[in-house]
Regions:
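Blade-level signature of beta-propeller repeat domains, shared across WD40, Kelch, NHL, RCC1
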Residues: 94-126
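WD40/WD-repeat beta-propeller blade N-cap
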Residues: 32-39, 80-88, 126-127
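Structural hallmark of WD40 beta-propellers
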Residues: 1-6, 49-56, 66, 97-101
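Residue-level recognition of a conserved intra-blade site in WD40 beta-propeller repeats
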Residues: 44, 48-49, 93
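WD40-repeat beta-propellers
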Residues: 14-19, 42, 64-69, 109-114
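Beta-strand initiation motifs
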Residues: 22-28, 72-78, 117-123
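Structural signature of WD-repeat beta-propeller blades
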Residues: 3, 40-43, 53, 89
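Conserved strand-to-loop turn within each blade of WD40 beta-propeller repeats
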Residues: 7-11, 57-61, 102-106
Length: 127
C-alpha cells in the first residue's frame, strides 16, 4: 500500500501526495479545487478496510467539503457539507470515520453524521 498524505493552504487547494519509494520523493497525485478562499484544514477519514477514501476540507470561505475516491487512483468527487457563513477552522473525524466535528468562526462546534444513504445530518452543536 502506497504512502499518501493530504495538504491544504492559501492557494485555495487541497493536494494529495503519494510517496515514490524508488525516487525517494513525494509527488502530487491529485489537486482538488472547490474552495473560494484559503483552505484552513483537511482531515483524512479512516476507511476501516473499505475500498473508499474520504477527506473533509474546510476554509476561510465558510464551507466544508467532503471528498470521496471510490477506487485507487480514481477521480475525487466533492460534496458541500454546509455553508457556515463564517470561516471554518478545523475538521476532525471520529475513529469510525462516519462522524465529523466542525469548528467555525461563529464560536460553534457542530457534529455531523453520515446516514446509510450517504446524506450528512447535523446531530449536535455547542457554542
Amino acid at each position: 500500500d502506497a504512502k499518501r498524505l493530504v495538504t491544504c493552504g492559501c492557494d485555495n487547494l487541497v493536494k494529495i501526495w503519494r510517496r515514490d519509494e524508488t525516487q525517494n520523493a513525494w509527488g502530487c497525485e491529485a489537486t482538488l479545487s472547490a474552495h473560494a478562499d484559503w483552505v484552513r484544514d483537511v482531515a483524512w477519514s479512516e476507511n476501516l478496510g473499505l475500498p473508499m477514501n474520504t477527506i473533509a476540507s474546510c476554509g476561510q470561505d465558510g464551507k466544508v467539503f467532503i471528498w470521496t475516491q471510490s477506487e485507487p487512483r480514481g477521480p475525487w468527487q466533492s460534496r458541500q457539507l454546509h455553508d457556515f457563513g463564517a470561516p471554518v477552522w478545523r475538521v476532525s473525524w471520529s475513529t469510525m470515520g462516519n462522524i465529523l466535528a466542525v469548528s467555525d468562526g461563529n464560536n460553534t462546534v457542530t457534529i455531523w453524521k453520515e446516514s446509510v444513504d450517504g446524506t450528512w445530518n447535523q446531530i449536535s452543536a455547542a457554542a
